[in-house]
C-alpha cells in the first residue's frame, strides 16, 4: 500500500497554544507510527495577537492560502486580552476563517471520563456523552466585529443581526442527522435535538421549520425540539438524555461551555469546525496567558481535537488508517482516566502539560 501523506496547516497561535498543539502533534505522531502508511506533514503558520504586535497583521503572508490548500487546519489558541485592534476587539483571524472556508458545522463533544471532576451528584452523570452542533457562519455572529457588517453602530446604539438562511441551515441539520447515525453505530443514543427560540424569533422559527422538514429523511434517528432556555435547565438536570443537539451560533457558543463545565472544564473541550471542503480543529478554550510558559496547561482538549481531525481526514481522504490512529488516541485517554493516570492541574491534580503528554505517549499501544 502506498503511504498516505496528509497536509495539515498548523497555527500554534498565542498563550498556551504553542504548548498544547505540540503535545497533540507528539501524540498524533506516535499513534500514526502504530498504523500502516500514514504520514502527516505539519506546515507551521504564524498568526494571532503576538504576531499582530510584531507585524500589524493577524496572519503571515500567504498563511490563509496555505490553509485553504491543506487537507485540514489545526489551531492551538489565538488572541490575548491585552492586544486589541483600534475598535477594541481582540485579534481573531479564526473567526474570519469560519466564513472564508464556510465552516458551518461546529462540533463540540462533551463526554464524562472516570476520575475527572463530576459537577453533578447524580450517578447518571458518568454517562454524559453528547455533542453540541453549533452553526458557525451566521446566526448572531453574522455581525461579529471581525465581519464589519453592523448597519447601526455608534456611541448611543448598536444593532446586531441574527441571520438564518435555508441553505446553511439545511446543510447543518443534515450534518446533525448523519453525525447521529455515525454515533448510533458506536452505541450512542441515535437522537438529534433542535435547540432554538422558535416561539420568539422568526429566524429561529425558520431554523426549526427546516429541522422538521429534514427529520423524516432519517427515520432511524429520533428527533425532538427544545427551547434554548429549557435546554440550559435540562443540561443541569439530565444531560445524559441527549446525543446530538443542533443550534444557532450564539446558543451553541454558550451551551457548549456549559457542557464543558459539566465534565471538568474547558481543558477537555475539543472542537471541530467543518464545511463541505475544509475543516478546522482546535481546543474550545482560550489562550490562557495567565499560565503561559508555566507548563500547567491541560493539553487534552487539543489532543482530542487532533483525534477528531484524524476522523475527519479519514472520511475526506478515504484514509481508514487515520481512523485507526484516532481510535488509538481515544483509547489511550480513556485508559489513562480509568486508571487515574491523567491528573491535570486544572482538576486539582499534580501533572504538568509535559507529564500528561508523556503519560498518553506511554499508553499508546
Task: Identify the residue ranges that each predicted region occupies.
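Extreme N-terminal starter segment of soluble prokaryotic enzymes
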Residues: 3-8
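Short acidic loop-to-helix transition motifs that present clustered carboxylates
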Residues: 115, 226-233
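N-terminal glycine-rich phosphate/adenylate-binding segment common to multiple enzyme folds
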Residues: 52-159, 250
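Glycine-rich phosphate/nucleotide-binding loop
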Residues: 49-51, 107, 234-340
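Buried hydrophobic positions in well-ordered alpha/beta secondary-structure cores of metabolic enzymes
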Residues: 14-17, 71, 133, 176, ...
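N-terminal beta-loop-helix "entrance" segment that forms/cooperates
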Residues: 37-61, 235
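Glycine-rich phosphate/diphosphate-binding loop of Rossmann-like nucleotide-binding domains
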Residues: 9-26, 30-35, 152-228
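Flexible, glycine/charged-enriched surface loops at secondary-structure junctions
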Residues: 36-42, 184-195, 218-226, 316-328, ...
